[in-house]
């Protein structure tokens, strides 16, 4: 069945100001072949992440959500088999995630009841990070809750992450609250209260996000949405979806994670 493979979308390009546009000198970094492989070759961040996902799940369906000007380079690095959801305009994470979700259902013909994970394109982590995402996908497909996030066990009171406060210390817990990126003192306070770093990973069934999308956007399918994309409001996924969901789950990841 399709249920036992991981659907994962790597958010790049037009999905947020931090990553837009990738063609600027400081942001072409995920394409630069500066990482050493075990056998001494060099690879880019994108190639490394792609290989890691397939080590964790050889049958994974990997899609990159990005701007049109990056598509050729992504195909060059990952081959023609990589799926690309092209964003025709610079919007925020909600439109990007909705467009990619519609692409999976309407273009790739993935069952809307399947689960998908959205992840930034540039996590520097070991394979266990992607194994945790795979496990989150399997979990959310079997429970009534709609949305799962990944929480990283903090190693220091960093100011660059948002924080997730879980209700319990279990591997998987309901979320009690979210905290915006804090200053150092508040970060330490959050950590003392058991907060986790928000890894920026969202896991949900495609049907869930498309239902929410149709409540906020008037469109019939992927092709219609693509045509209207330039008219969409800029709105973050957190603001459009996360803030309105009552029961959000967080899964812990105890390993190391850096966003390059």
Residue ranges and their predicted role:
Residues 2-73, 80-82, 86-91, 103, ...:
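N-terminal glycine-rich phosphate-binding loop and ensuing alpha1 helix
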Residues 10-12, 65, 117-120, 149-153, ...:
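Short beta-strand segments
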Residues 19, 74-75, 187, 209, ...:
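Hydrophobic packing residues within well-ordered alpha-helices of enzyme cores
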Residues 166-193:
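A short, charged helix-loop
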Residues 195-204:
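A conserved mid-domain beta-alpha-beta active-site/ligand-binding segment of alpha/beta enzyme cores
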Residues 259-260:
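Conserved small/polar residues in nucleotide/adenosyl-binding loops
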């Amino acid at each position: 069945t399709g249920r036992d493979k991981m659907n994962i979308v790597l958010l790049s390009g037009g999905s947020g100001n931090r990553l837009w546009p990738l063609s600027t000198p400081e942001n072409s970094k995920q394409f630069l072949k500066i990482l050493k492989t075990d056998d001494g070759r060099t690879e880019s961040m994108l190639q490394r992440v792609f290989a890691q996902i397939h080590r964790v799940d050889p049958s994974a369906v990997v899609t990159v959500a990005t701007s049109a000007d990056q598509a050729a380079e992504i195909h060059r690095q990952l081959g023609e088999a990589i799926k690309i959801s092209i964003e025709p305009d610079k919007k925020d994470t909600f439109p990007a995630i909705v467009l990619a979700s519609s692409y999976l259902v309407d273009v790739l013909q993935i069952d809307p009841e399947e689960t998908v994970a959205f992840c930034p394109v540039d996590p520097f982590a070991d394979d266990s990070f992607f194994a945790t995402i795979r496990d989150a996908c399997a979990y959310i497909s079997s429970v009534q809750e709609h949305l799962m996030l990944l929480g990283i066990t903090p190693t220091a009171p960093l100011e660059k992450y948002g924080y997730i406060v879980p209700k319990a210390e279990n591997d998987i817990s309901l979320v009690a609250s979210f905290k915006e990126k804090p200053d150092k003192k508040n970060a330490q306070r959050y950590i003392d209260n058991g907060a986790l770093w928000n890894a920026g990973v969202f896991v949900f069934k495609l049907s869930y996000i498309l239902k929410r999308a149709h409540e906020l956007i008037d469109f019939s399918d992927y092709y219609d949405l693509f045509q209207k994309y330039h008219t969409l409001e800029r709105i973050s996924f957190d603001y459009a979806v996360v803030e309105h969901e009552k029961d959000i789950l967080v899964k812990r990841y105890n390993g190391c994670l850096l966003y390059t």
